[in-house]
């Protein structure tokens, strides 16, 4: 069995994930033991925001072993990074091996020295692209990080919520 926990209030435009913390912690403290009692052997995927805090709270109050609990972490941030790089270089996302680390959202970071495209370090790939395409600007790491960190808030401001990307990222975990 797999249990996906998405409970909690959603972000409103202009709100940070951390603004949701106390309310969502209280919700998690209430539901975690009840769900764990019904499905003690399940694998749990925590998606509620702020996801790192909610995963920690679930682990502490549910009684479920840590080996059965996964937080969605920065999988969505990583997908946004790969999307951005795939459009920049006009290549398939499956060929991009770059990750976002840290806490999901505004405090995440990109370890650029680990990023690769088809096995080639991103810095070398970037040098080849700039050399071959005189019109191509160099990658701006800060701008890319800002895009990754702020995309969720921009979607919420325009659409009111982020549904599809979150669902797709959970599907990838499963």
Mark where each language-model region is.
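N-terminal Rossmann-like NAD(P) cofactor-binding module of classical short-chain dehydrogenase/reductase
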Residues: 3-4
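Rossmann-like NAD(P)(H) cofactor-binding subdomain of soluble oxidoreductases
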Residues: 16-82
């Amino acid at each position: 069995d797999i249990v996906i926990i998405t409970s909690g209030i959603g972000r409103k435009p202009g709100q940070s994930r951390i603004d949701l913390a106390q309310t969502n912690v209280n919700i998690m403290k209430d539901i975690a033991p009840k769900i764990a009692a019904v499905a003690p052997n399940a694998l749990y995927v925590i998606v509620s925001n702020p996801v790192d805090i909610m995963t920690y709270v679930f682990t502490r109050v549910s009684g479920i072993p840590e080996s059965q609990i996964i937080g969605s972490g920065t999988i969505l941030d990583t997908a946004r990074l790969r999307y951005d790089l795939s459009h920049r270089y006009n290549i398939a996302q499956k060929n991009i091996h770059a990750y976002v680390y840290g806490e999901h959202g505004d405090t995440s970071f990109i370890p650029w020295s680990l990023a690769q495209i088809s096995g080639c370090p991103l810095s070398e790939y970037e040098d080849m692209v700039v050399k071959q395409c005189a019109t191509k600007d160099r990658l701006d790491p800060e701008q890319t990080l800002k895009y990754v960190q702020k995309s969720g808030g921009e979607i919420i401001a325009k659409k009111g919520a982020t549904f599809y990307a979150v669902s797709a990222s959970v599907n990838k975990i499963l």
